[in-house]
């Protein structure tokens, strides 16, 4: 039972970190997610959620750096690529974001990532991001 329990600790830290994020307890979330990342360096999930904590605070440049660091190790993680695009949209970098979103949709590797990318792309097209305006081509 000891080894089986120990193997679950990183997953539990990720879940607790995500829960703290949803509750707005961002410092607690970051501490839990960093612990999970240290125990599971091969898993992009804790660091992707870490980027979400920065995004939640409006620290879009820090979220971007965090997502890019994840993608340096996990280049095809389309969910992280979608969150990166969201951080670019928040920084009004429409062209970069739209290209990234389209690449996620075109790759079609991860259903949740594709749905998120399509939703963000549709919002850009409808001009829901201030200053983005509808696409002209």
Residue ranges and their predicted role:
Residues 7-35:
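Alpha-helical segment of the N-proximal tetratricopeptide repeat
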Residues 11, 45, 79, 112-116:
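Start-of-helix register in tetratricopeptide repeats
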């Amino acid at each position: 039972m000891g080894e089986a329990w120990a193997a679950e600790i990183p997953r539990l830290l990720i879940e607790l970190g995500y829960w703290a994020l949803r509750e707005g307890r961002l410092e607690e979330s970051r501490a839990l997610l960093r612990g999970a990342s240290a125990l599971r360096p091969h898993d992009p999930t804790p660091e992707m959620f870490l980027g979400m904590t920065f995004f939640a605070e409006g620290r879009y440049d820090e979220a971007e750096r965090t997502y890019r660091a994840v993608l340096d190790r996990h280049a095809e993680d389309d969910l992280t690529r979608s969150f990166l695009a969201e951080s670019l949209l928040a920084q009004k970098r429409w062209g970069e974001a739209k290209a990234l979103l389209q690449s996620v949709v075109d790759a079609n590797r991860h259903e949740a990532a594709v749905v998120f990318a399509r939703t963000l792309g549709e919002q850009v097209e409808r001009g829901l991001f201030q200053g983005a305006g509808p696409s002209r081509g």
